[in-house]
């Protein structure tokens, strides 16, 4: 019991940090089930698309179609959808003779506009008859953007390795717990308080510890403590940018990749320089992901500064 209480304290401390003024997250203790999660998503979707819906709520059949569209076969498929069109992620609903193009997320509205940032914990991932050998699970902390869980966090106390969190996530994926709206998760975070890592979402058979990355600050110093990690990576706009700007689709292997800290810092430095009209270059050693860095740097600059000559 003492260990369980300790981990609940760890969880609360993280939520408190995420919801402090500068982080922009709102804690939603009222969302614990799949039904509550879908209801919350529906409310946000309707609020952000009032004009297109003509203030008429989505019907049961319309929303059933949306729920089906958001229930992906893989995290990679979710990633393809989340790329969107010119920074906007849509769902499409047929209403009479008209097709409504509803904006789920606008990645041009990071840290403002129509973006809604919420934190949930102890989500109940229930047992399903289709999941042989499975049982009910409770997720630690999940971060929702416009009602969709995009980042999931598993926490351990100091008596455990962060790898226990990694293995736990792998087990949950194998059991099919990341289904429905949770199939949209793009990034996982695991921590034992003093050692914190992140990695891209993948099938359980594709999760490999070699893709786990720690965070480094701009001075190349490791950020290990989970609260320090939350301050550096999980506040807004950083968390939204991790899934919207620094996640890459590997279309050959059909999997997600998330940039490593040095790649992200390089892209951010180039972005800041471009805003000031300065030039420069990114230097990477052999095998450090130059192609991926250059691709994401170019894509992000085009999104930030539309006037750049393509």
Sequence positions of predicted segments:
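ATP-dependent helicase/translocase motor core
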Residues: 2-309
């Amino acid at each position: 019991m003492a260990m369980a209480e300790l981990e609940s304290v760890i969880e609360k401390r993280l939520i408190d940090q995420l919801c402090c003024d500068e982080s922009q997250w709102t804690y939603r203790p009222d969302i614990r089930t799949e039904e509550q999660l879908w209801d919350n998503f529906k409310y946000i979707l309707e609020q952000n698309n009032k004009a297109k819906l003509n203030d008429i709520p989505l019907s049961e059949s319309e929303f059933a179609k949306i729920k089906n569209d958001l229930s992906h076969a893989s995290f990679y498929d979710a990633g393809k959808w989340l790329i969107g069109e010119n920074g906007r992620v849509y769902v499409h609903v047929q209403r009479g003779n008209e097709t409504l193009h509803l904006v789920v997320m606008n990645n041009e509205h990071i840290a403002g506009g129509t973006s809604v940032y919420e934190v949930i914990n102890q989500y109940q991932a229930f047992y399903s008859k289709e999941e042989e050998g499975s049982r009910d699970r409770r997720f630690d902390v999940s971060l929702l953007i416009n009602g969709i869980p995009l980042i999931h966090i598993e926490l351990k106390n100091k008596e455990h390795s962060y790898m226990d969190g990694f293995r736990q996530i792998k087990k949950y994926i194998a059991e099919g717990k990341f289904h429905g709206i949770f199939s949209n998760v793009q990034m996982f975070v695991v921590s034992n308080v003093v050692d914190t890592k992140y990695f891209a979402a993948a099938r359980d058979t594709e999760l490999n510890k070699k893709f786990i990355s720690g965070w480094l600050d701009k001075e190349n110093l490791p950020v290990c403590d989970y609260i320090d990690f939350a301050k550096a990576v999980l506040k807004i706009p950083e968390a939204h940018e991790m899934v919207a700007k620094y996640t890459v689709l590997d279309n050959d292997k059909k999997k997600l990749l998330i940039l490593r800290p040095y790649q992200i810092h390089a892209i951010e430095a180039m972005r800041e320089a471009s805003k000031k009209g300065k030039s420069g270059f990114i230097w990477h050693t052999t095998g450090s992901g130059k192609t991926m860095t250059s691709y994401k740097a170019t894509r992000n600059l085009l999104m930030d500064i539309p006037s750049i000559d393509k």
